[in-house]
Amino acid sequence: MRKLRNTLAAISILFLASCGGNKDYYMFTSFHEPANEGLRYLYSEDGMHWDSVPGVWLKPELGQHQLMRDPSMVRTSDGTYHLVWTTSWKGDLGFGYAYSKDLIHWSEQQMIPVMAHEPTTVNVWAPEIFYDDEAEQFMVVWASCVPGRFEKGIEEEKNNHRLYYITTKDFKTISETKLLYDPGFSSIDATIIKRAKNDYVMVLKDNTRPERNLKVAFADSLTGPYSPASQPFTESFVEGPSVEKIGND
């Protein structure tokens, strides 16, 4: 979710003209099940009440299943939108990437093979993109299951996820994949927020039964180490968190 200035570029001209020409909007990337159609948008004037933008804006072409699940996007200071997404439920060793200047016309899609060094990896789920304004580079965090790598716990071996990350300045040269967080249980759907310098919050899903809820962890560095996960702050069966500052909240 990003607060967009000067409306939503050309999409505003096509669909949001009635909302006025010089307002700020929040934007949310989304998808419809079974996730083979492609990228969808929602917009809001206040961050609380949302409406959909009609249409599909990028059809997935990558991966064994050619899906677009969990799309995550940031905009950099030059006005470029950078998008990452899940390409398959299982079998792929990377995530999808594309960029755009106007949210309508997108670059060629690329598979970023972040788990190619771990050929037994079950999946690469829910990549979340973060722009590090201090290091002037992107960080992408995702969940993968590497059977036998971590203590099994109550989840079966092929559902025992941990959180990994890479950094890159251009999605051409990619850093070594590293483990970001092992909370001691299967975890997915992490998103990271910078509240201030040396103050980072990670919201993640505890994917173990019967939890299936959201927790938080804290760090003074983007790449950690992060604190032990908190107690859950949601009911069970909640996932896919997004965080945005709205006013003073």
Task: Give the predicted meaning of each segment.
Residues 1-8:
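Bacterial N-terminal signal peptides that target proteins for export
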Residues 9-17:
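Bacterial N-terminal signal peptides
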Residues 18-249:
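Carbohydrate-active catalytic/glycan-binding domains of CAZyme proteins
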